[in-house]
């Protein structure tokens, strides 16, 4: 779905909201104002995609995004090297100076931009979701639509403009992705909070990610509940255009307990438990304020994506009063949570738990809460008007922490122990802002916490010498002599390496977690096959390591990859093509204690077309769409996806040993029969009673020759895929096919080897 196609809407009863605010975390977003340009219409002379005419046609564009040709820095740019030239202390000093240097065109609340930048950081990182790893701060995606124009990101375009002089000063050495996270972290430190550190390494993207943000076609709509009211997979937010939930309550209903349910779901889907959730909400709402001085529909013009050229990328032009300062309109909610909005205190928890609250409405008409004790209504200084006093406020979502029994226990504990509260928030903030960065080895800078967190999927450093190419060659021979079959070795190597997700850089072959729970028991991985291969390879590992006297060892992770390479070399040779499959050793083995079973369970494939595996109950898209999704997560191009699937079919790598798509009489050899057969006009395909299976019959005799699934037949049906398939079906394509397969296979085996790449950016590996 093209999220840039917004339908024109007026202000609805729902004033768009999530869990923070301009001043804090996530609350300052707005309803789509009258006059917004995002209409979802096609402009004159605009070319129409094939999906416009045939919506069910497979969209391959995710496999063509983030091309290096979009990168003005060039494919050889080394961000890690550029970042190393930074004086990070000087960058922080520059940010600190900016924080208290208020600009007339966008004055700082309470004289400090810290809360504003905290919200920027939160919303940059807060789109991350665990189910598919998409979203997050890596890439600096908030610079681009649709995120740039989401209602929840209202006025954050100004935050980035405030930071532009710093970005301009440091140029390519400081990415927008890093700067947006660093600004909020420094903002906290400026206001007296002791953070847990900061790591650079977020390489900038140069175009928006293609992400499914929900089924809705209007901003702030919510049509994403499945059976039993569960939030549709893989989404994390409850409304289109929001980071998390509606702070006024579920679909605008001021129900704190209902809000608690939504909060628990949304935060769990961004990898946060109850304690982290309370720490983040309470800690974030300690700072700053929300903005609803006027009704958005009466004041605001179009979001950035719909604004005129003269606005130069800025949106939400405010035509009421000053247009900023005390007239600022963002979410429609208005006010600060604490009496000291630019200081780290426990006042948020004191206010929340200690006061009784009554429902009211902001000047914009949004539902919010103020203390029943009216003597408190003059306890909060105004952000801009000297001498004016206001009441502290809470949202319905804030009150969820008071009324939900589990959240309240945590909040009371934090209030009683400020040190525990501070530590919990510091760790949760670091996790929030670094969760999508992948392994710790990608981190840059001198402010990285020494502590290893289990959510970083730690892999130990080798305390031994790495094996040589000569050792690899010998081990290949030993593995082939071990009695393990080509299919067993290929399946296990693929199962381990293909767990990689480019979206959040989790999974992969390193760590040999295929030999640990939960991965060993995943249905798609054929647990019995994995156990047999792992057991045999461990025998070889023990034998090899016991014979070495030079402190040289081989890891199980390397052995699994070596085994797959050996199997492919044999399969290619059996097909008449001699080839060497490269292996770069250096992987190490994680332990079960270093593996968060619940967290890793989210990586379990619900579909893997390369193994002809599809779980209809768990998958949220069609088999062919899941094929593209899987290929996208593996950073494959269209040709790489094509050659890998065809080769794996000939190798007999299907889960469960099914024959669907195995269009060859020479199973276990690396041949191009899949493509030759699929394009053979002597074979006619027809549906069966099982909608997921097709039969290929001899066009002359009617004899059933093969069976296939949608992910097999799409390579002959889709015109783009057929064009590529033809190349591999040529009479002289045997060698090209094998060489291309080996290249694509090796790419998958090394996707998580960031030590072998300088760009740090998996997205640009295409």
UniProtKB/Swiss-Prot annotation:
Transmembrane segments: none annotated. The keyword Metal-binding applies. Keywords: Heme, Hydrogen peroxide, Iron, Metal-binding, Oxidoreductase, Peroxidase, Signal. There is a cross-link at residues 244-270 (Tryptophyl-tyrosyl-methioninium (Tyr-Met) (with W-122)). Formation of the three residue Trp-Tyr-Met cross-link is important for the catalase, but not the peroxidase activity of the enzyme. It catalyses: H2O2 + AH2 = A + 2 H2O; 2 H2O2 = O2 + 2 H2O. GO terms for cellular component: cytosol. Belongs to the peroxidase family. Peroxidase/catalase subfamily. This is Catalase-peroxidase. It comes from Alteromonas mediterranea (strain DSM 17117 / CIP 110805 / LMG 28347 / Deep ecotype). The gene is katG.
């Amino acid at each position: 779905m093209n999220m840039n196609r917004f339908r024109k809407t007026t202000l609805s009863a729902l004033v768009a909201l999530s869990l923070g605010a301009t001043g804090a975390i996530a609350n300052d977003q707005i309803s789509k104002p009258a006059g917004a340009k995002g209409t979802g219409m096609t402009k004159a002379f605009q070319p129409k995609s094939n999906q416009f005419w045939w919506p069910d046609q497979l969209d391959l564009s995710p496999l063509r995004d983030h091309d290096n040709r979009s990168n003005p820095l060039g494919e050889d740019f080394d961000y890690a090297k550029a970042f190393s030239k930074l004086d990070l202390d000087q960058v922080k000093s520059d940010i600190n100076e900016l924080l208290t240097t208020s600009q007339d065109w966008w004055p700082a609340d309470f004289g400090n931009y810290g809360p504003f930048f905290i919200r920027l950081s939160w919303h940059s990182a807060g789109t991350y979701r665990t189910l598919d790893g998409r979203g997050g701060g890596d890439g600096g995606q908030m610079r681009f639509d649709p995120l740039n124009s989401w209602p929840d990101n209202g006025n954050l375009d100004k935050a980035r403009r405030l930071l532009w002089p710093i970005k301009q000063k440091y140029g390519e050495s400081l990415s927008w992705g890093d700067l947006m996270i660093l600004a909020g972290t420094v903002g906290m430190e400026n206001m007296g909070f002791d953070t847990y550190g900061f790591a650079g390494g977020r390489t900038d993207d140069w175009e928006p990610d293609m992400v499914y943000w929900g089924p809705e076609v209007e901003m702030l709509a919510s049509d994403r509940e499945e059976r039993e009211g569960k939030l549709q997979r893989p989404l994390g937010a409850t409304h289109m255009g929001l980071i998390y939930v509606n702070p006024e309550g579920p679909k605008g209903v001021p129900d704190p307990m209902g809000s608690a349910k939504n909060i628990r779901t949304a935060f769990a889907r961004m990898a946060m438990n109850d304690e982290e959730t309370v720490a983040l909400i309470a800690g974030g709402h300690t700072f700053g304020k929300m903005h609803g001085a006027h009704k958005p529909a009466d004041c605001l013009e179009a979001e950035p994506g719909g604004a005129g050229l003269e606005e130069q990328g800025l949106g939400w032009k405010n035509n009421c009063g000053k247009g900023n300062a005390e007239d600022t309109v963002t979410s429609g909610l208005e006010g600060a949570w604490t009496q000291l909005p630019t200081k780290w205190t426990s006042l948020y928890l004191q206010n929340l738990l200690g006061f009784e609250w009554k429902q009211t409405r902001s000047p914009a008409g949004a539902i919010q809460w103020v203390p029943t004790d009216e003597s408190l209504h003059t306890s909060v200084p105004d952000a801009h008007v000297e001498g004016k006093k206001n009441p502290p406020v809470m949202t319905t979502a804030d009150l969820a922490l008071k009324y939900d029994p589990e959240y309240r226990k945590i909040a009371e504990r934090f209030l009683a122990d400020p040190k525990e509260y501070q530590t919990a928030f510091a760790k949760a903030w670091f996790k929030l802002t670094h969760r999508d960065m992948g392994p710790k080895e990608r981190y840059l800078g001198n402010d990285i916490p020494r502590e290893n967190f289990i959510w970083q999927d730690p892999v130990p450093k080798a305390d031994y010498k790495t094996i040589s190419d000569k050792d690899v060659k010998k081990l290949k021979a030993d593995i082939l002599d071990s009695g393990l079959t080509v299919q067993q070795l290929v399946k296990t190597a693929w199962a381990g390496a293909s767990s990689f997700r480019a979206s959040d850089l989790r999974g992969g072959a390193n760590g040999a977690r295929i030999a640990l729970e939960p991965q060993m028991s995943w249905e798609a991985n054929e647990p019995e096959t994995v156990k047999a291969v792992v057991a045999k390879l461990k025998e070889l590992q023990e034998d090899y390591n016991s014979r070495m006297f030079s402190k040289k060892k081989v890891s199980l992770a390397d052995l699994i990859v070596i085994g797959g390479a050996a199997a492919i070399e044999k399969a290619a040779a059996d097909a008449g093509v001699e080839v060497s499959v490269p292996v770069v050793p250096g992987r190490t083995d994680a332990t079960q204690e270093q593996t968060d079973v619940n967290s890793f369970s989210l990586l379990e494939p619900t579909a893997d077309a390369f193994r002809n595996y599809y779980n209809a109950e768990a998958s949220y898209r069609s088999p062919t769409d899941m094929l593209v999704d899987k290929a996208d997560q593996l950073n494959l191009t269209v040709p790489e996806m094509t050659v890998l699937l065809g080769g794996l079919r000939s190798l007999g790598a299907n889960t469960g040993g099914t024959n669907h798509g195995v269009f060859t009489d020479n199973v276990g050899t690396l041949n191009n029969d899949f493509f030759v057969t699929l394009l053979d006009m002597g074979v006619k395909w027809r549906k069966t009673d099982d909608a997921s299976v097709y039969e290929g019959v001899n066009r002359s005799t009617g004899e059933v020759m093969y069976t296939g699934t949608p992910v097999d037949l799409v390579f002959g049906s889709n015109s783009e895929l057929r064009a590529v398939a033809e190349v591999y079906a040529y009479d002289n394509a045997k060698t090209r096919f094998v060489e291309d397969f080996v290249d694509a296979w090796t790419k998958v085996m090394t996707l998580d080897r960031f030590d072998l790449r300088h760009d740090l950016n998996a997205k640009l590996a295409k």
